[in-house]
Amino acid sequence: SSFVGNVWGVGQSLHVVGEEYKPLPEAIEIVWLSFTENKFYFVSEWLPKNRLQSLFDTVWMNVRKIEQRYNGLVVGMAPYGMIQIWAVGDGRRTEVCCLHGPEVPVKMSEFRPRAIISQDEYVKSTIEDEPRVYENLKKNGLPDSLLFENYRKRFNYHIVPEIEMEDVDLTQIAVHYFNGEYDVILWERLKENLYSLQA
């Protein structure tokens, strides 16, 4: 069990056991507590093998001209039983897949074996530790589930940077996308001016 952070797409809780390099996972099984809903969800699914293999076979050059590859996975858990999985590497975070699972009953004693407070108290105290989130939920409630799906919609982007400062030698640009993806684009690659589908 682990408490995870609240930055979409950014891994904040790390679990590594055994050998340094491992085969790509075939499936995921996870139970989590959605604090904003005070509900447990469960996902048990096969992962898209070809997509994972394709991503982990991808090689790119970083700003120091060193070959890079994806070297990890990040799992994000959202309300309404949604999880999103990203492949991560130096300067890149790319969506692998999005999965959904049902609400499930979980006893607090199973979730936090030494808990001395109820699930409701635990959820309330955890959310109150994030004042901006807490106030926003009180004021606006939880967004519709379509919001999370809409964040994943891809559009054909064509990035054309305009630099106002003179004598600036840019080597890269960092782009954060709504679906949690992230890309550090080398200036040479950006000058190719290719269109790409991004969320």
Q: Residue locations for each model-derived region?
A:
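Tryptophan-paired
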Residues: 2-34, 173-199
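Exposed beta-strand and adjacent loop surfaces of beta-rich binding modules
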Residues: 27, 70-72, 82, 156-158, ...
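Short beta-strand edge segments in extracellular beta-sheet folds
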Residues: 45-52
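A eukaryote-biased signal for long
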Residues: 110-199
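Short acidic/polar inter-strand loop motif in beta-rich domains
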Residues: 33-42
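Compositionally biased low-complexity segments at domain edges in trafficked proteins
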Residues: 54-151
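Solvent-exposed loop and beta-edge segments used for protein-protein assembly and interaction
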Residues: 20-24, 37, 67-69, 151-157
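Short acidic, gly/pro-rich beta-turn/loop elements at beta-sheet edges
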Residues: 40, 53-55, 85, 169-171
